[in-house]
């Protein structure tokens, strides 16, 4: 089993934080339109992006959103996030009709004002009006974010063979193991998994070597 993250920059394979969409950024397809609830479940947003032309989309945000998140600022510093002074310039970069993109943005801003998204039922506790530039955009597509499958371990981080026996001296933790999370996982749980079983594997492997 794998978990897909919806917004990974291609070809750098840089994961673009959900903080961008959570802060009010929107997803735009190659027709210059929104196509999904940007902050819905990862698998749903990923599937929606893959259904778009060429299987990718653009994240569109403004200066206010960039200023709210140091990760986003980092994307700009390394050249992944592109900056534009107007929507017309953004449309040129995306190769979409500027009038269509402006209409998409006008609709979005009206949804923010009304706190209601009749198209995709987005939550509006953190939505932002995007009428003011400058604007920033980055192209993204879904990418593998976490693997839930792997070797079986016990509570001592010892790897178990296919016959159910402990393999002496072999320890494992994290994404190379399976059975810890089932078919999906929550980020905080995965961190706990890596920390707890990682420390256990390190301690027990050191003890084993010292025998």
Question: What kind of feature is each model-predicted range?
Answer:
Residues 1-211:
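Residues forming the flavin
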